[in-house]
Amino acid sequence: MTITDLVLILFIAALLAYALYDQFIMPRRNGPTLLSIALLRRGRVDSVIFVGLVAILIYNNVTSHGAQMTTWLLSALALMGFYIFWIRTPRIIFKQRGFFFANVWIEYNRIKEMNLSEDGVLVMQLEQRRLLIRVRNIDNLEKIYKLLIENQ
């Protein structure tokens, strides 16, 4: 096993750990989930570049008769990238005392002001940061509003 294979295993393990945390552990942290809303995906250009580069590496490894283990590891990395970038849906998860947005826990008392833009983006101003929440279904903004009013 080469250093390349070890690095690939490390990256695959990191992506797998992130996927498991995002899918199974995060919804169970900090109490029961009150509301989970699907968000719009960000630009997919980065993901296309990543998966495309891994596909080029697979092609290069196969045509130069590289190690079969490396080909399998590159394929696993491409599949993990495909899952994380295209199959997994980003979500905002509301709990009793706060919410998870982009895998970061934010307590409700940190929200200084909220606005709704004309194009349906909920803007939450924190102490030093502004969150732009783009929901997939515009009707979910009303659910978020009701939940925040109940918990404030």
Swiss-Prot record:
InterPro entries, per the entry: DUF986
Localization (cell): Cell inner membrane
Membrane topology (UniProt): Multi-pass membrane protein
GO CC terms: plasma membrane
Zinc in keyword set: no
Main location: membrane
TM spans (from-to): 6-26, 45-65, 67-87
Family matches, as Pfam families: DUF986
Keywords: Cell inner membrane, Cell membrane, Membrane, Transmembrane, Transmembrane helix
HAMAP family linked to this entry: UPF0266 (MF_01071)
NCBIfam families noted in UniProt: PRK02913.1
Sequence similarity: Belongs to the UPF0266 family.
Identification of the protein by name: UPF0266 membrane protein YobD
